[in-house]
Amino acid sequence: MSLVYMNIIMAFTTSLVGLLMYRSHLMSSLLCLEGMMLSLFIMATLIILNAHFTLASMMPIILLVFAACEAALGLSLLVMVSNTYGTDYVQSLNLLQC
């Protein structure tokens, strides 16, 4: 396995561990999710470029669209929770009665 792939897998794993460990604040959870999506995007792009998959060339773009939608929803939820309760704790999400 190439050193580039190992670094990307390590970045994904580090973001996943960060998401599992620092889940008390919503902002840190969102940053870890963005790190995971970025490493998935880079990995998908490298695999498609190295394997010359012409039919799957749209997959990284679709992944970026989903990452942008996830970021927009997460930031809007962060703004709503911080304006309503004054904190960005994930425990405040249980009070929203969604």
Curated annotation (Swiss-Prot):
Enzyme class: translocase
Pfam families in the cross-refs: Oxidored_q2 (PF00420)
Mitochondrion keyword on record: yes
Entry EC no(s): 7.1.1.2
InterPro entries membership: NADH_UbQ_OxRdtase_chain4L/K, NUOK/Mnh_C1-like
TM regions (residue ranges): 1-21, 29-49, 61-81
A single GO BP: ATP synthesis coupled electron transport
Recorded superkingdom: Eukaryota
Chief location: mitochondrion
GO cellular component, one term: mitochondrial inner membrane
Catalysis performed (reactions): a ubiquinone + NADH + 5 H(+)(in) = a ubiquinol + NAD(+) + 4 H(+)(out)
Membrane topology: Multi-pass membrane protein
Keyword tags: Electron transport, Membrane, Mitochondrion, Mitochondrion inner membrane, NAD, Respiratory chain, Translocase, Transmembrane, Transmembrane helix, Transport, Ubiquinone
Localization of this protein: Mitochondrion inner membrane
An example Gene Ontology molecular-function term: NADH dehydrogenase (ubiquinone) activity
Similarity annotation: Belongs to the complex I subunit 4L family.
Record-linked PANTHER family: NADH-UBIQUINONE OXIDOREDUCTASE CHAIN 4L, NADH-UBIQUINONE OXIDOREDUCTASE SUBUNIT ND4L
Record text on subunit structure and interactions: Core subunit of respiratory chain NADH dehydrogenase (Complex I) which is composed of 45 different subunits.
Function of the molecule: Core subunit of the mitochondrial membrane respiratory chain NADH dehydrogenase (Complex I) which catalyzes electron transfer from NADH through the respiratory chain, using ubiquinone as an electron acceptor. Part of the enzyme membrane arm which is embedded in the lipid bilayer and involved in proton translocation.
Annotated protein name in UniProt: NADH-ubiquinone oxidoreductase chain 4L
Organism annotation: Hippopotamus amphibius (Hippopotamus)
